[in-house]
Amino acid sequence: MLKVPLSDVLSQKMLFLKSFRYFHCTKYFSRDNASSTTDIFRNAMKRKRELANLKEQSHGNVARNAAFPKEYIKRPKQVPRNATNRKKILITWSTGTDRAKEAANSVVSEIFKKNHKGNIKVVDPTTHRIEASNIRYFAKGIDLDKVGLSIVNVEQIDNENQIPLVKIVESRVALKKYSDFLAKKKEKELMELGVLNKSYKNLVTDKKEDNLKHIKISWQIESDDLKRQKAHEIVSLLKKGNKVTLYLDDKNNINSNNWLENFEELDRSQKGEPPRLPESVFQKRAAVLETLKEIVSEYANDPVLLGNMNSKMIMKLIPKDVKPQNNDKRALKELRKKERQEKLQKRIQRKKMNEM
């Protein structure tokens, strides 16, 4: 009989037990827990397949839109065309003083604010027609020692873009307009800082502007409107002691945004005469001017006329008498009564002259 040492037997048993030391049977496999185990496995496999399909769909254009709707896709916002942080476009001027260059650059900057491409409309000095252009090309060759730029009107194209109407004016006119622009800008800054009160601004404007009234009249105005509405407006201002300036021009020009700038050059003598109008148009304008003279003859001194009927005119009116204060009601009534009597006498005299 083979005898095995007891130590060898014990060591073999220990090796056999060590091979099963990591196996722990905590729950028996039965019908009750089989369904739950299967569900866990099935859900895990289902989730794995969904992730795989989603990954494949993300590589396709059509499937990608289905997997990621547009509302969940973040795209960088596009910068609008007329953004304020756009690089400034400067034009180099070879002529003119520093002040003239600043005035021209101010106009160019305003043009690009209204139209980011710099598209403009210009008035041809020879044909007097409005033509399309671009400020980059239009500004070439301009002698700032003699002339300057001015925006006389703005045409609205859409919500973002506008087309300015640019005109070449004398250098002194451009500098005067630029000085006014800087003065208004400085005044606005002082008011924002609280240094300048609105009452001071009103006090200055009261002395300069309140006593001078501006009325624009179209050459195409109807006779009834001129004799009623406009006549009442003009006479009322003259009776109050206000100085009145009448501006007569074509309907298209008088209704523009910067209509007043068209009259800046009438104070100086113009070179050459404007083109002659048809006889019917000229007679219509002559009738308008004569009617205005008749309306203001009783309440204003002899009017000062500038310009001519072929283009535009200015009529400056100064009231004859200074009316008394509002608190002197009796004197005011007597004055109105006297005016009515004088007016009635003139009508009677005109009627007698017509009968003769």
From Swiss-Prot:
GO terms for molecular function: mitochondrial ribosome binding; translation initiation factor activity. GO terms for biological process: mitochondrial translational initiation. Keywords: Mitochondrion, Transit peptide. GO terms for cellular component: mitochondrion. It is found in: Mitochondrion. Residues 1-32 form a transit peptide. InterPro entries: AIM23. Its main location: mitochondrion. Disruption phenotype: Increases frequency of mitochondrial genome loss. Belongs to the AIM23 family. Present with 319 molecules/cell in log phase SD medium. This is Altered inheritance of mitochondria protein 23, mitochondrial. The gene is AIM23.
